[in-house]
């Protein structure tokens, strides 16, 4: 599974890459950071991005879009609006006011936790996960497992940027993955 950007979205990928600033040695030496804030401020680029993410899932009858803190909160609501779906935030621990379901997952050096309201998803609802970046696949996998623990059916995952050289799809083989932009370094 997993689809590269295709059709109309693919035709616009080069334009979107031109709008992303590359920042070397951020957040630490040896890391090349892809700064999307320059894309966000471009109204045509931002609209193209939201349209392309939405169009990939438009025929899937999505009930909810799950946005992962923090940049998933930028794209998720706009995609949800386009899909006539609800939006659910997936947050860091202690940020949601009502009862939550949590999922702990391993990082290279330690662990992290994601939370969602316990009543955010009804059993059988079709959801997509939207975030800015697919790097190692750990956060996406944790978000999917968290949603599935509440009875969600994961219809797919949509990302703005995918770091192909980290091979993130190996953790996510059972999911339909759509990434607009691919980087090999």
Predicted regions and their residues:
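Conserved G/P- and acidic residue-centered "switch" motifs that form tight phosphate/ATP-binding loops
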Residues: 132, 137
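Short Gly/Thr/Asp-enriched flexible loops that form oxyanion-binding sites at enzyme active sites
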Residues: 74-85
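PRPP-dependent phosphoribosyltransferase catalytic core
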Residues: 2-8, 12, 18, 141-185
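Short, glycine/charge-rich flexible loops or terminal/linker lids adjacent to PRPP-binding catalytic cores
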Residues: 85-128
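Short glycine-rich phosphate-binding loop at a beta-alpha junction
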Residues: 62-69
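Conserved acidic residues
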Residues: 63, 125, 155
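Active-site-facing substrate-recognition patch
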Residues: 2-62
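Residue-level signature of catalytic and energy-coupling elements of molecular machines
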Residues: 30, 65, 87, 157
